[in-house]
């Protein structure tokens, strides 16, 4: 550890070298905790990560195009939040199967082996997406209202597989169009705040898999504060408890979608989620306090 004020590097990507706009106050908030924090691009060869008392993964949004390189980088960091093994688990959405096996309610998810076996059944909508992805990059929504829906869904799945991606399918849950998505954020294992996020996949959308730095990733989102109910909190906490590895984690975002039978988990975001700090007064200071504790105590070894 350094002598004097702890030093923290906030890992980001080259597209946003000074971090996501939502976190522009984080460096100053860390300073209020007596911590020197600065942004650094995760794949910049000139960065000396060993100089930091703690490296915090934040807006590394381009990692999906170089996941193995990103995980090698993470495993090479001695003190990393969140830890490398957690990043590996969370960066591939096949974890939804593991959550379901542990009794966590999740969006029904199928791994596609043969793209030509896909069908969009009458009266349904199907989401086809890569298991590794950021935002809605690579995701397509196909409605049986179109006579060529099955053909289009198969073509999209085949394109994803041609890019080396594992393909997942999920039913499109119509209630998200009116109720939105509820994103629940935990800081240092404790519930911090939640937001409502509007639907991000309009009907008929087919996003390219190679657009991780394009419009799909940086598209403006409809965000507003939301108070989760007890059922939503319980589901989110059950998902958090099912995450393998050390707990508590510095930051967690659990994304829930509404159904007639209650909320279900769509994603467990442990790599580089937007935490919507601007939507929750005090949340940036809570995050900075948690970062300072870890930087000083030597927790979160990669």
Residues covered by each model-derived region:
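Active-site nucleotide/adenylate-binding loops and adjacent lid/helix of ATP-dependent enzymes
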Residues: 2-12, 74-77, 85-179, 233-234, ...
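Conserved N-proximal alpha/beta basic substrate-recognition cap immediately N-terminal to
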Residues: 3-7, 14-108, 113
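Phosphate-binding site of ATP-dependent enzymes
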Residues: 147-244, 264
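A short beta-strand motif that forms the metal-chelation/ATP-contact edge
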Residues: 52-56, 129, 182-186, 262-273
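A short, glycine/Asx- and small/polar-enriched loop/turn
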Residues: 48-53, 120-123, 178, 258-264
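Glycine-rich phosphate/pyrophosphate-binding beta-alpha loops
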Residues: 61, 136, 200-203, 269-279
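Short secondary-structure junctions
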Residues: 35, 104-105, 123, 243-250
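ATP-dependent carboxylate activation and anion-phosphoryl transfer catalytic cores
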Residues: 190, 228-302
């Amino acid at each position: 550890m350094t002598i004097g004020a702890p030093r923290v590097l906030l890992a980001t990507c080259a597209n946003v070298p000074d971090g996501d706009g939502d976190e522009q106050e984080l460096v100053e908030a860390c300073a209020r905790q007596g911590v020197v924090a600065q942004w650094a691009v995760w794949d910049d060869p000139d960065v000396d990560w060993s100089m930091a008392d703690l490296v915090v993964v934040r807006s590394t949004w381009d990692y999906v195009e170089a996941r193995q390189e990103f995980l090698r980088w993470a495993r090479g960091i001695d003190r990393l939040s969140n830890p490398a093994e957690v990043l590996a688990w969370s960066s591939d959405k096949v974890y939804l199967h593991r959550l379901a096996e542990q009794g966590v309610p999740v969006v029904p998810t199928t791994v596609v082996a043969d793209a030509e076996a896909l069908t969009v059944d009458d009266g349904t909508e199907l989401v086809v997406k890569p298991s590794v992805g950021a935002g809605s990059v690579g995701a397509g929504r196909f409605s049986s209202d179109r006579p060529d829906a099955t053909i289009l869904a198969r073509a999209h799945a085949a394109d994803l597989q041609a890019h080396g991606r594992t393909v997942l399918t999920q039913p499109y849950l119509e209630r998200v169009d009116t109720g939105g998505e509820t994103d629940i954020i935990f800081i240092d294992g404790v519930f911090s705040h939640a937001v409502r996020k509007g639907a991000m996949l309009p009907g008929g959308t087919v996003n390219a898999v190679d657009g991780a730095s394009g419009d799909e990733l940086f598209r403006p989102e409809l965000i507003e504060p939301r108070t989760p109910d007890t059922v939503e909190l319980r589901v989110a906490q059950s998902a958090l408890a099912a995450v393998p590895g050390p707990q508590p984690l510095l930051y967690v975002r659990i994304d829930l979608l509404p159904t007639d039978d209650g909320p279900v988990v769509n994603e467990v975001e442990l790599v580089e989620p937007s935490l919507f700090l601007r939507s929750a007064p005090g949340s940036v200071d809570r995050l900075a306090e948690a970062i300072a504790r870890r930087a000083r105590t030597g927790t979160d070894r990669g």
